[in-house]
Regions:
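Membrane-interface "cap" regions at the ends of multi-pass membrane proteins
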Residues: 1-30, 59-64, 68-80, 86-87, ...
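Membrane-embedded translocation segments of transport machinery
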Residues: 2-9, 165, 169-314, 318, ...
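Inter-helical loop and helix-membrane interface segments of multi-pass membrane transporters/permeases
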Residues: 3-7, 34-39, 69-91, 104-163, ...
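Select transmembrane alpha-helical segments in multipass membrane proteins
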Residues: 8-19, 44-47, 84-97, 142-148, ...
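Loop-to-transmembrane helix boundary motifs in multi-pass membrane proteins
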Residues: 14-16, 22, 138-143, 254-260, ...
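C-terminal membrane-solvent junction of multi-pass transporters and transport-like membrane proteins
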Residues: 88-91, 325, 332-344, 382-441
């Protein structure tokens, strides 16, 4: 059994900061702006916010309730209420483990760029070539990823409640301030940044279709952190008197605010300088280094920007590494420290394969079946697709079925509202879990396999 049962419960502010920190990460700062730019700007932002309300919020509530009721790991918490549905939590854990693996690779890239800015700020004349050469190299990416995982293990070695809550109370406000300062500075000094701001906030539905809608649904799962087991795990440490409904809203608001801030920094800057966003990695590691080079004080801005990414990485890893760790502890009956070392070793081992798949293992391709045929991806991209476009929405879909069929609305309402102390389960809440959320997640799953 997890040591969460004996763990001191989070304070309300501490929980909100920890939960927001777990949800906020590279998905918000790296992936959200790229998708918003390519999927219609303001149109994507508007649909994203709507889906966050329709899909993100109900599932955050549900996962928190499952975790607080179970007081254990994601898998065990689902099993406490109904043993036959334990597999839902296992799917969450497998998904998070895969995300941990490739997330660690990207985190190492972030640390490399931060260190380079601090030391020299020199990325050569061809920023794309610099990036490509670095990620395809063998030794350096592995070293930087090892440094990241070592930092995370060092902090978590002393316990999630004591370390994570204190760190998140500092990291999350600091991240918001860093992004806000960078965004305001860009609007002041970048010619044409106002046009980028208009593109970002004024909807253009001419570029919006099924692909963009599926992207928005997937991004809500990835960005808010639903389907990972994040809120089930953190819910295990929530006070029994906590207002789950209100806390879920605060987590949603904090997450969306940081995502919008990231777009506020990046999109006006890129549009104003005439740069192109061709992919997620190119956005942060190529386009932004090109942009910072042209700005007064660009090296300082680069240091602060990549520092904010490191804060996001650390705050996210504090929780997403804990999710598989708790499962390992339950299965191996080892201590917190031993299970942490085992989990971190497995994650780093997987990240080595992902990193090398961009270089010396680039020849190794894994099959990806779809209605349109079979595609082949390297290990990194395969883990990304499986976790983001299949396991995340599948986890959300099964959570809906679990609440509706296994737990039942009556028992769910008792846990969610503290037996009516914090309101009641509305007809809309029931409709969300029974119809709206399942339909939205099915759209993503069917789309990724080429059916729609």
């Amino acid at each position: 059994m997890s040591d969460h049962k004996e763990a001191k419960s989070f304070s309300r502010f501490g929980y909100i900061m920890v939960a927001a920190g777990a949800a906020i990460g590279l998905g918000n700062i790296w992936k959200f702006p790229y998708l918003a730019y390519g999927d219609g700007g303001g149109a994507f932002v508007l649909i994203y916010i709507v889906i966050c309300i329709l899909l993100g919020h109900p599932i955050v509530q549900a996962e928190q309730a499952v975790g607080r009721r179970g007081r254990a790991s994601a898998a065990a918490s689902y099993g406490v209420i109904h043993p036959k549905w334990r597999f839902v939590g296992v799917i969450n854990i497998v998904c998070t483990f895969l995300i941990d693996i490739y997330y660690l690779v990207v985190s190492g890239w972030v640390l490399k760029y931060f260190v380079t800015y601090v030391v020299s700020g020199d990325f050569g004349k061809d920023k794309q070539a610099y990036f490509d050469n670095y990620i395809s190299s063998t030794t350096q990416p592995l070293i930087y990823s090892l440094i990241i995982i070592a930092i995370i293990v060092f902090f978590l070695f002393f316990g999630i409640t004591n370390i994570v809550e204190k760190a998140s109370k500092v990291i999350m406000p600091m991240l918001a301030v860093l992004l806000l300062v960078c965004g305001i500075y860009a609007l002041i000094v970048v010619p044409g940044a106002v046009d980028g701001l208009k593109y970002y906030f004024v909807p253009d539905f001419s570029k919006f279709g099924m692909q963009q809608f599926a992207d928005a649904c997937m991004q809500v799962c990835f960005s808010v952190g639903i389907g990972w087991g994040i809120f089930t795990t953190l819910g295990a440490s929530m006070n029994k008197d906590a207002n789950l409904k209100a806390d879920a809203w605060w987590v949603d608001i904090c997450d969306t605010f940081i995502a919008l801030l990231a777009g506020f920094v990046i999109i006006p800057t890129v549009v104003g300088t005439g740069s192109e966003m061709s992919s997620g990695p190119s956005l942060v590691f190529v386009a932004m280094t090109q942009i910072f080079e042209t700005l007064p004080g660009g090296r300082i801005i680069g240091i602060f920007f990549f520092a904010s990414l490191i804060f996001a990485v650390i705050s996210t890893f504090f929780t997403i590494l804990e999710i598989p760790r708790m499962y390992v502890q339950e299965k191996t009956h080892t201590s917190h420290q031993v299970s942490l070392i085992i989990t971190a070793t497995l994650v780093y081992g997987g990240s080595v394969l992902c990193s090398l798949s961009k270089g010396i293992l680039s020849w190794l391709k894994l099959p990806w079946p779809s209605f349109q045929g079979i595609a082949y991806y390297d290990i990194y991209d395969w883990c990304d697709c499986l976790s983001g476009y299949v396991l995340l929405p599948l986890g959300v879909l099964l959570t809906c079925f679990y609440i509706v069929k296994a737990w039942g609305f009556n028992e769910y309402e008792k846990e969610l509202t503290n037996n009516g102390k914090h309101g009641k389960l509305s007809m809309y809440d029931k409709l969300s879990l029974a119809v709206i959320c399942p339909v939205l997640t099915l759209i993503v799953i069917l789309h990724v396999f080429g059916f729609i």
